[in-house]
Amino acid sequence: MTPITDEGTTVALPFPTDAQKYSSPWKRTGTQIVIDAYEGNAINWTQMATDPRVVGVIHRATIGLQADTLYKSRAVTAQQRGYLWGAYHLGKSGDPITQAKFFLSTIGDPTNIFMALDLEDTSASGMMNIANAKIFLNYVFQQTGRMPVVYANNTVVKAINAAMKGDVTFAQTQLWYARFVSAIPGFPSGVWSTYYLWQFSSEINCTSTGHCLYNVPGTSFDMDINVFYGSKAALAAEWVH
């Protein structure tokens, strides 16, 4: 169980059967909001600071063998402002170890950094496939002692379930689940029994600033928004698992 603080009251919330976890959990004041951005997303840090529920920022560090131009400067800004900081690699086709080395060299000391591997479409020719994802994950683990979180949408999760049932590597990861709905009608249990973070809003399901499922001040409709079903303390404790 993970405690959740809701208006000053600590309530035990069982995982993964609690229906509230899968139905607009961002509407509960005790849950936490995390944005994830890349160089194309604008952030007004002063405005964003007016929302105390936004506690973390995950930023694209690398895509294939290219670095995000705003990663390093935003890493400094976010951490100076007290946000939990994270980095993700968007996996492309090509040697996964070379990509993993580039990702680690870009983020620097990973001690306090949430790390994730973004698997957008494992069946597309230009994207990282599941076999190479496993190599990437294992390399990062060997170098850091920590297994990255896996970002995947519903289709990719199902593909991983089919290909990696019982796999030791994927069993050590947590899921950053992309599904742009207000309620999840059926979580695809398999490798993962539940999500760690749920990305529920982006330009895919929000086309007008201020009219998203959740609106983070200082950002536009195209900002990716995620929810953590638990307290700020719980998220901080699990951030660099």
Regions found by a protein language model. Give the residues of each.
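A short secondary-structure junction signal
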Residues: 128-129, 159-164, 209-210
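Histidine- and/or cysteine-centered catalytic micro-motif in compact active-site loops
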Residues: 90, 120, 153-155, 180
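Active-site-proximal helix/loop segments of hydrolytic enzymes
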Residues: 142, 153, 167
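Short catalytic/ligand-binding loop motif for oxyanion handling, primarily in non-cytosolic enzymes
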Residues: 125, 157-160, 186
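Substrate-binding cleft of extracellular glycoside hydrolase catalytic domains
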Residues: 8, 12-147, 172
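Functionally critical loop-and-helix segments that line ligand-binding/catalytic clefts
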Residues: 2-41, 45-47, 51, 166-241
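Glycine-rich, charge-decorated loop segments at or immediately adjacent to ligand/cofactor-binding or catalytic sites
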Residues: 96-101, 156-168
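Aromatic-lined carbohydrate-recognition surfaces of secreted/lumenal glycan-active proteins
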Residues: 145-159
